[in-house]
């Protein structure tokens, strides 16, 4: 429906239509992989690919929502072009947060969720699967630090950018909450409820991060053209 609406409407630009088409392709792939997941008896690596596609779909939807709900209303523009340095920083931010999600799915997939019963470290336990579990924690910690760096840089340099400030505050707050929830989950003996909340907040972190990236890219790109 989204693809048909985008293609038939004159309200959407070429880029938005392309994103809608990519979203459609990803949804089809996700459906096919969903069947493969069942047929392979929930092989963890297939679920990992399935999750990656699902997160890509979410990212595309955030871009479309941004283009329709915000960019079309002409938000505050930054009166300078987007530099290569910021392009690298924002791209790396997206990759780092994506790695947090994928590493978390990897931990769940190999059954390593509850192997580390202490926080923030895993005691003196080493080797597989303890190292995989700790890798997820290290990546999450690095993501918090790097997101904090990007957020501080954006807010300091572009203090007049309302949407930029709101988006980075949301992303930073959510990833901080996510790490706290991870600790509570360990102390709460890996309650199914806490694990569900942990997963839900992880999705919100991804959405908020994509919003940070597209809001910054969108403002600069429109101004520099």
Task: Put a short name on every predicted segment.
Residues 1-225:
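Polytopic transmembrane helical bundles with strong interfacial aromatic enrichment
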């Amino acid at each position: 429906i989204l693809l048909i609406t985008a293609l038939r409407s004159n309200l959407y630009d070429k880029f938005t239509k392309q994103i809608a088409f990519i979203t459609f392709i990803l949804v089809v792939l996700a459906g096919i992989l969903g069947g493969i997941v069942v047929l392979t008896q929930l092989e963890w690596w297939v679920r990992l690919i399935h999750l990656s596609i699902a997160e890509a779909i979410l990212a595309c939807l955030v871009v479309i929502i941004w283009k329709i709900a915000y960019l079309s209303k002409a938000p505050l523009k930054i009166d300078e072009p987007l530099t290569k340095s910021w392009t690298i920083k924002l791209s790396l931010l997206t990759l780092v947060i994506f790695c947090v999600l994928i590493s978390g799915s990897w931990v769940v997939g190999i059954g390593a969720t509850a192997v580390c019963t202490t926080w923030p470290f895993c005691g003196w336990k080493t080797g597989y699967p303890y190292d995989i579990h700790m890798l997820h924690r290290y990546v999450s910690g690095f993501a918090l630090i790097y997101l904090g760096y990007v957020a501080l840089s954006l807010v300091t340099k572009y203090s007049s950018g309302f949407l930029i400030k709101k988006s980075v505050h949301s992303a930073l707050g959510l990833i901080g909450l996510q790490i706290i929830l991870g600790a509570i989950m360990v102390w709460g003996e890996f309650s199914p409820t806490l694990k569900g909340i942990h997963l839900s907040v992880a999705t919100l972190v991804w959405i908020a991060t994509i919003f940070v990236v597209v809001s910054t890219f969108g403002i600069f790109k429109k101004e520099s053209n």
